Amino acid sequence: MKWLGIALVLLFAVSACGKQGNVVPNVAVNFILQLNDPRYTSLRSIGSAVTVDNYGVAGIIVANTVNGYVAYDRCSAYEPEKRCAVTIDDNKLLVTDPCSGSKWLLQDGTPNKAPAVRSLKAYIVYIDASRNYLTVSN
């Protein structure tokens, strides 16, 4: 009976580990966005968001929210192995995974519509107001 208990605990532990699996991979991110650059001047306004290609796993989204600047990897947190890049909704409040239909809030990266259950991968945003630029890194 003791061995049965140990076997059940081990079986549960092994199967639970498999469910933790799919997360957005860690990649080095470190770049500067000049807010004077015409591609990014909209970020001066609260409620704006832009995409930046060639960084992160599937690109980066940078947004100016009521709580400040945020940055997320565009790689969907739902089935990230598919590398589906989320897109910014017209209202600039949500992003959508075109592969699954999942949605996340830009404000904090939390899931807003199933099947997503994990938040978007966030990056750190440093603001240098005197030089008018943002640094995004991890």
What is each PLM-predicted segment?
Residues G18-N91, L105-L106, S119-N138:
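N-terminal pre-ligand scaffold of iron-sulfur
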Residues S76, T96-D97:
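Short cysteine-rich clusters marking metal-coordination/redox-active sites
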